[in-house]
């Protein structure tokens, strides 16, 4: 991955960062390092969040361990998602390089810029964008998802105003030096709610999703807040790069809390998916002949009838998904049920389940919660121990190797929600797993030799969230 970062990766070494096509990216070098956002915010420990560097090179003496920790200079940040200053969208520009990891803090509003180029094994803080300046110039707060643009600018979704109102959501545009340029969207074209976004330049479109009002989700999840309209069920279709809101797709009850959104990687394709957490659906969106966009439910995870839980039925809660670089497979996490699913999406209209594995969840054997079968017979899922450790929480964030053969998994969603649904996760910390993927016939299996225990960190148990490779990946790089 260091070779990729330095643009010495075979076919991609003659131009800008990344790869010319998604398929060329699949032939990139195997990952050796992975950066993980690690969180102390909300755990009761007065320690700063940090960026953990994990060794994922099997031949290394420090394989499957944290080899470096970069603490942030402030407390109570809540690191969450991340992105790059430049990626494959800048492939045609030799003046660009993938050097800085952009780390927004969901609660404090600080946007950290991390230098990963000087020493990839020991990243350092380059600067941070002051939330007071962002607020003064744009009115935006709660920064969430950054994406690099072909222009060299960085676009960051923001989820509300300083009071946590969703009406204040929008998109922050930073220049290549991380100075504030302003809002990206045109005046009066802000989304109803904010969260994730993905753009497909050949179709002159960006689509963004809807978590909810920060004033609601930062207090924990309350089902009443959904009925009170404090959570989203919409996809926002923008003209790219003009920033005009062209359409709002109302997903209804089959699309509650749409979080992650991904177009297919092939830039000519005018379709993609959004993962809707509460409805536990993958909604496919697609362009019509008249240039408008429509949607349909492509995947639906049925709720479990349960005993000894807060509700009689438990949703899967799809909190993350990703798509392999060849657009063959989609992987999604059911954070509450505890399983990871692999679908063949060669025909995006009709995904086929090809793999499933349980790596935690509220219904694993030994837990208090029981699932009920069709005839009312109680059951629980078998979840293996890894290196003698019982798996805590449920599968949450993913990262897939470039070749599609290794899926990395962490288990923290958001510290307040972790404490609400998985208190043991806050007490004992997260862990990181690696799933081996059969890319021929389909199928998933746990790598028993890989287990990173964030419960044994020097400053106490921490929560592990999003992951990034130094050389880019299938959830950061966009092809133009």
From Swiss-Prot:
Tissues in which the protein is found: Expressed in young seedlings, mostly in roots.
Single GO MF descriptor: selenium binding
Keywords: Selenium
Residues reported in the UniProt entry to bind selenite: 12-13
Swiss-Prot/TrEMBL induction comment: Slightly induced in roots by cadmium.
Disulfide-linked positions: none
Pfam families tied to this protein: SBP56
Family of this protein: Belongs to the selenium-binding protein family.
Classification via PANTHER family: METHANETHIOL OXIDASE
Name listed for the protein in its UniProt record: Selenium-binding protein 3
Source organism per UniProt: Arabidopsis thaliana
